[in-house]
């Protein structure tokens, strides 16, 4: 292909992370987005109303042809993809494992925008798992799509530091933008023939499993640093939670926003015990020191400060108030 010819692209993606890549493609004069594939509209939220994906909304704003097959088992759907005549497919958080017939639908194959430094964190939740594991660095990988999950040869990578108080939601937004920029750079170099795929080392591969609500259950038996990483990693979803049990009173299911690592425990305390109020924050005992929570939300209530929660829910406790995590209601 001549370097001056725009790449004809079919884009495949669904959530906000993918929409950032599509936005960068639409702003680049080196390509022509001829079609967009995204997941079918699905019920979401408390009202369970069907809502279009972020990618669909952006595509429609730009008058693009949007397709939403449930899968590609029907040959007619595969043929419809071929009929776009794309040079290459671009995939970003699409939500479907693509069959070989789809990968073969464009002469240059398919490339994917992945939110980690592969081969680390293959799978559905690379951003959240990196934060939950306390990693200091993550990044974006643009790689060729093969049948095996996230295992294709790498085209470009770029690292990004993870702040010690950064949540997965905040990191997601940074990586989404980085992914869009790196995608355009990758496609420009593919178009010019100046990029060489690098095989992944499967021996170094790790897997980032999709998060469930159970991942938000705070494990106070960990160190405060590990608890902080867990809470940051599950923010905004599924959110960090536990059940506070008070002797002679009703259990309280609460969620918390990321706090700060507090001082070492002055004396041994059962992990999960509330050991005091420190500068307006509730101090929870961890394995080694305290974790200070400044924003807490009881079930079916609005978020409140740690001090307000202390006064409203713990004022009848004498001394230490026992609180520990349970899975019920996850």
From Swiss-Prot:
(6S)-5,6,7,8-tetrahydrofolate binds at residues 116-119. Its EC number is 2.1.2.9. It comes from the Bacteria. Keywords: Protein biosynthesis, Transferase. It catalyses: L-methionyl-tRNA(fMet) + (6R)-10-formyltetrahydrofolate = N-formyl-L-methionyl-tRNA(fMet) + (6S)-5,6,7,8-tetrahydrofolate + H(+). CDD domains: FMT_core_Met-tRNA-FMT_N (cd08646), Met_tRNA_FMT_C (cd08704). Belongs to the Fmt family. This is Methionyl-tRNA formyltransferase.
């Amino acid at each position: 292909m001549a370097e001056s010819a725009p790449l004809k692209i079919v884009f495949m993606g669904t959530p906000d992370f993918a929409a950032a890549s599509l936005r960068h493609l639409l702003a680049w004069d080196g390509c022509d987005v001829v079609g967009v594939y995204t997941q079918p509209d699905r019920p979401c939220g408390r009202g369970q109303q069907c809502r279009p994906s972020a990618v669909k909304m952006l595509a429609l704003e730009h008058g693009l042809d949007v397709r939403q097959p449930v899968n590609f088992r029907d040959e007619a759907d595969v043929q419809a993809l071929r009929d776009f005549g794309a040079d290459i497919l671009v995939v970003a958080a699409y939500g479907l494992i693509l069959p070989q017939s789809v990968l073969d639908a464009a002469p240059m194959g398919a490339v994917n925008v992945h939110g980690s430094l592969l081969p680390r964190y293959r799978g559905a939740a690379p951003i959240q798992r990196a934060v939950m594991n306390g990693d200091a660095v993550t990044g974006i990988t643009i790689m060729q799509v093969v049948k095996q999950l996230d295992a294709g040869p790498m085209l470009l990578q770029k690292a990004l530091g993870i702040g010690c108080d950064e949540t997965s939601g905040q990191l997601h937004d940074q990586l989404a933008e980085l992914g869009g920029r790196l995608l355009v750079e990758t496609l420009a170099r593919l178009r010019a023939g100046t990029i060489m795929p690098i095989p992944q080392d499967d021996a170094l591969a790790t897997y980032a499993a999709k998060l469930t609500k159970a991942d938000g259950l705070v494990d106070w038996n960990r160190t405060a640093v590990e608890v902080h990483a867990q809470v940051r990693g599950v923010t905004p979803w599924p959110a960090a939670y536990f059940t506070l049990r008070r002797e002679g009173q009703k259990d309280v299911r609460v969620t918390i926003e990321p706090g700060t690592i507090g001082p070492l425990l002055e004396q041994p305390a059962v992990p999960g015990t509330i050991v005091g109020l420190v500068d307006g924050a509730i101090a929870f005992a961890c394995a080694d020191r305290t974790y200070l929570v400044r924003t807490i939300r009881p079930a079916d209530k609005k978020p409140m400060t740690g001090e307000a929660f202390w006064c409203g829910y713990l004022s009848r406790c004498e001394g230490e108030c026992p609180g520990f995590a349970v899975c019920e209601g996850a």
